[in-house]
Amino acid sequence: VRRFHELFFTLSPDKSAIEGNISRALLLADKSAYNYYRDFSEKGYYNRIVAGNINQVVQVDSVLCDFDRYPYAVRTYARQMIIRATNVTERSLVTVCRLLNTSRSDDNPNGFNIEGFEIVENKDVTTRKR
């Protein structure tokens, strides 16, 4: 779950790097994550990252997982830093999903597939000048 968030939400102003990381992230999840990618892409989010020379870094604070019931319910708390030429914005990111057991592979070494991925919160916390 941590690796998925790092791949999906850490972006650099390089189109091929974005596509590579997103592709690797989507190998760990079902269509719910792809739907977010498609929505962000259609709204021009990734193009604005590249055009604005913006770096976005995610730091996962905690991953809460209920291993008592299957599929395993997960809630992830993270911080996003959106680094622009003139300012840095810190955002709060909270997501939920479920984990399904799956075969381990080179692309998915932990053997879990993320399903029902949903962004619950993604709001600005602070913005400071650079």
Kindly give the residue locations of the regions a language model identified.
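Juxtamembrane and targeting peptides
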Residues: 1-11
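Structured, amphipathic secondary-structure segments that form assembly/contact surfaces
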Residues: 9, 13-130
